[in-house]
């Protein structure tokens, strides 16, 4: 899920970067055209809205409640086990250092 989000974010940034670069080239050709600037802003806004909707759709499509609950349960059990084993290990180290 995280890698898909990063991929979508990368694609959005790539599209925006290409759009900005094209806008800069067009702006250098005709710097006094406000209509061109409006078109570029609308284009960037539409690309952003499309990418945002696609990312939200992808997130909602891949989100599974049962998997989320299983992951939370596995995390809580494994962290409880690690806490127990860390306590035992710490106790053993103290016993070795104290010499009893």
Curated annotation (Swiss-Prot):
Annotated spans, Lipoprotein lipase cofactor: 78-100
Pfam families assigned: Apo-CII
Keyword field contains Signal: yes
Compartment(s) of residence: Secreted
Post-translational modification: Proapolipoprotein C-II is synthesized as a sialic acid containing glycoprotein which is subsequently desialylated prior to its proteolytic processing. Proapolipoprotein C-II, the major form found in plasma undergoes proteolytic cleavage of its N-terminal hexapeptide to generate the mature form apolipoprotein C-II, which occurs as the minor form in plasma.
Signal peptide annotation: 1-22
Chain intervals for the UniProt region annotation (Lipid binding): 66-74
Highest taxon of source: Eukaryota
InterPro entries: Apo-CII, ApoC-II_dom_sf
GO CC annotations, alphabetized: chylomicron; high-density lipoprotein particle; low-density lipoprotein particle; very-low-density lipoprotein particle
Alphabetic keyword roster: Chylomicron, HDL, LDL, Lipid degradation, Lipid metabolism, Lipid transport, Secreted, Signal, Transport, VLDL
Alphabetized GO MF terms: phospholipase activator activity; phospholipase binding
GO biological process: lipid catabolic process; lipid transport; positive regulation of phospholipid catabolic process
Coiled-coil ranges (or none): none
Family according to the record: Belongs to the apolipoprotein C2 family.
Stored PANTHER family: APOLIPOPROTEIN C-II
Task performed by this protein: Component of chylomicrons, very low-density lipoproteins (VLDL), low-density lipoproteins (LDL), and high-density lipoproteins (HDL) in plasma. Plays an important role in lipoprotein metabolism as an activator of lipoprotein lipase.
Name of the protein in question: Apolipoprotein C-II
Taxonomic source organism: Bramus lutescens
Lineage, top ranks: Eukaryota, Metazoa, Chordata, Craniata, Vertebrata
């Amino acid at each position: 899920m995280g890698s898909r989000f990063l991929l979508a974010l990368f694609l959005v940034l790539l599209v925006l970067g290409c759009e900005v670069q094209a806008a800069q080239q067009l702006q250098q050709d005709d710097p006094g055209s406000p209509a061109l600037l409006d078109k570029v802003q609308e284009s960037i806004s539409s690309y952003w809205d499309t990418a945002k909707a696609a990312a939200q759709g992808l997130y909602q499509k891949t989100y599974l409640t049962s998997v989320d609950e299983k992951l939370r349960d596995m995390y809580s059990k494994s962290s409880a086990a690690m806490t127990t084993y860390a306590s035992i290990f710490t106790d053993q180290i103290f016993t070795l250092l104290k010499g009893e």
